[in-house]
């Protein structure tokens, strides 16, 4: 079947438009006082609200997929389910939406790391969407969204200058645990799989290269997280205060 006629395109378009519509709805919600006076923080707040919603839905969805099809934990290349396939399409639609949102809002320079991540994620997901291979790997990758629930909540509190409240202090420890369980652990497991098996195949080699680049990004983000929450500077500079854009 020609790629342009693939039935997955309506699913991707529908998911992308869903997130676009969601953003319009969320933009009507009241803004926190520390956010509404700054256009950059306002855009970032709305962007994070969409991300937060995606993380909740996709994180729970990924856990449900693995519960329904546990062989995805082992048969990473061949395991397939309707639930998992729709999840990968849904999340790919989010990454398309967020990429367009960043570019249209002229936040490319401030959010270039997100763009790099989104391009790599979409490249990996498309192998499952258009060739129906490694759908299980895509679902395992999306376990990271469970961690992103707490990571996004952390960033939203930082934007709102709420680092001193109890919720932030509790969340930073929960966030650390979730980072290990749902980000570092699945990523290490997938990397081991692709190094041993899939790296010998053409598509597997492509996905392995993406995975290794994501490994580097995840470790960099982890070091930033530790430094920001557990080894903060006493008198942060203006540049440090604005790091909510990438941290």
From Swiss-Prot:
Residues 124-144 dip into the membrane without crossing it. InterPro entries: TLC-dom, TLCD. It is found in: Cell membrane. The keyword Electron transport does not apply. GO terms for cellular component: plasma membrane. GO terms for biological process: membrane assembly; phospholipid homeostasis; plasma membrane organization; regulation of membrane lipid distribution. Residues 28-46, 105-123, 145-173, 223-247 are extracellular. Pfam families: TRAM_LAG1_CLN8 (PF03798). Keywords: Cell membrane, Membrane, Signal, Transmembrane, Transmembrane helix. It is a multi-pass membrane protein. Residues 1-27 form the signal peptide. Residues 40-234 form the TLC domain. The chain crosses the membrane at residues 47-67, 84-104, 174-194, 202-222. Residues 68-83, 195-201 are cytoplasmic. Regulates the composition and fluidity of the plasma membrane. Inhibits the incorporation of membrane-fluidizing phospholipids containing omega-3 long-chain polyunsaturated fatty acids (LCPUFA) and thereby promotes membrane rigidity. Does not appear to have any effect on LCPUFA synthesis. This is TLC domain-containing protein 1.
């Amino acid at each position: 079947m020609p790629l342009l006629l693939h039935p997955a395109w309506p699913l991707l378009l529908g998911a992308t438009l869903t997130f676009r519509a969601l953003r319009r709805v969320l933009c009507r919600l009241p803004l926190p006082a520390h956010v509404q006076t700054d256009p950059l923080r306002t855009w970032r707040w709305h962007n994070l609200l969409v991300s937060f919603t995606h993380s909740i839905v996709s994180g729970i969805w990924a856990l449900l997929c693995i519960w329904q099809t546990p062989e995805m934990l082992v048969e990473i290349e061949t395991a397939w389910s309707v639930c998992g396939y729709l999840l990968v399409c849904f999340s790919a639609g989010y990454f398309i939406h967020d990429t367009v949102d960043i570019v249209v809002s002229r936040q490319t320079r401030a959010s270039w790391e997100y763009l790099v991540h989104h391009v790599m994620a979409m490249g990996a997901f498309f192998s499952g969407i258009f060739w129906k291979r490694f759908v299980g790997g895509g679902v395992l990758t999306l376990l990271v969204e469970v961690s992103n629930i707490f990571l996004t909540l952390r960033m939203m509190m930082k934007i709102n200058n709420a680092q001193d409240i109890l919720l932030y202090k509790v969340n930073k420890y929960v966030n650390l645990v979730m980072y290990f369980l749902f980000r570092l652990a699945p990523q290490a497991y997938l990397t081991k799989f692709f190094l041993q098996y899939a790296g010998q195949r053409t598509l597997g080699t492509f996905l392995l290269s993406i995975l290794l680049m994501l490994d580097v990004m995840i470790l960099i983000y982890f070091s930033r997280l530790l430094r920001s929450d557990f080894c903060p500077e006493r008198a942060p500079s203006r540049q440090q205060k604005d790091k909510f854009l990438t941290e």
